Amino acid sequence: LCPCRQQAAILEDLVTNVPLEFDFLFSKSHAEVISGKQEGVYAWIGINFVLGRFEHKDEEDAVVTVALGDQAEALVRKRTVGILDMGGASLQIAYEVPSSGTFSSPQQEEAAKSLLAEFNLGCDVQHTGHIYRVYVNTFLGFGGNFARQRYEELIVNQTYAHNSLQGQRTGLSAETPFLDPCLPVGLEDTVVRGGQTLHVRGRGDWQSCVELLQPLLMAPNNTQASLAGAYKAPIDFTNSEFYGFSEFFYCTEDVLRLGGRYDAPSFTTAAQEYCGQSWAVLMRRFHGGLYSAHADQHRLKYQCFKSAWMYQVLHQGFHFPLDYPSLRTAQLVYDREVQWTLGAILYKTRFLPLRDLRPESVRQAHGSWLRLSFVYNHYLFFACIVVVALAIVLYLLRLRRIHRRQLRSAQLDMLWLDKVVLLPPSTGPGP
């Protein structure tokens, strides 16, 4: 989304200014613009690391059989989790592909190569027990906010075209609004796109909204991927598990309070009930504190649309079955937020000799302590001198006291010897 020239300027600014503000080594190789594929791989590594999916399997753990490269025997190990992440601008999916599979055409095989990442998380390149093949795809323009913009362009263009053909004035004034199925009942709004203004009023028909969003699964333009037509590595829905983050969690939790294990029928019922409520009722509920503390009026306004969009993406775009039981929507994992940066650290340091680094880190820490103590902390330096000088003085005083005690003891011994009387030897009586 950021032009290459701006990317280069940001990196140059970092390389120039970070060393001025901080004292650690920072070179040009320490900053880079990563691709969506790299970010997806790092995010996948991070969440699976936190969940312990790279550890050796226990008896109760779900497992998967993995066939990699030229290995004669398939490997059985812990099943990893896939991730779904919908932001405001983009949509991302990443999951392990246990087997290479087959391709219907050379074009599909070529597309698959650009979307599959194979990497080793073992302690060295010979350790093949932790080689993973992960499918990663990022769809720009398919995030919740961008999808709404594309939807507004769609209804503006369609309504103006319909008016031109039928000689009508739908949406040209507040008295004859376009009835938007993706807004709550009675909510009035104005949409401006390409110099054209469309007056809309919500009619809260969630099912119609879902159907109206179907064309948006295609690519927004020729330079971006199409969710409907993009290559997707096969998913074994009978032996897989996914976590949905960001908009997947907000759509299910902030208003509907259904975060956690995703159940399509329950979600559909709750979404339809919400969309069918009048805007006035929703505002009363909002001011009454019935929704999540994270919910605001923007969330209430677009919840109907975003829930329909999430549903379309999940079930029509990625073809998740309606009875799929293993999707969880979440914001935190084990009470902490998992970022892709954790996966980046794990990936970058996977081959480092940690046992050799530990003594080195101790030496570096010791050297850093000396530098801080004797160069930057003058007070501590002078305090050490005072303590040493005081210790020397106390030691000399103690030696002096011991010397005096020994001298006094010697004088007493001499005085005692002077007072000793030498007696002649005794003689017995004569015969």
Predicted regions and their residues:
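Flexible, low-complexity interdomain linkers flanking nucleic-acid-processing modules
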Residues: G88
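Helical "lid/coupling" subdomains associated with nucleotide-phosphate turnover
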Residues: C2-V81, L91-P431
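Short hydrophobic beta-strand that contains or immediately precedes a catalytic carboxylate
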Residues: I83-D85
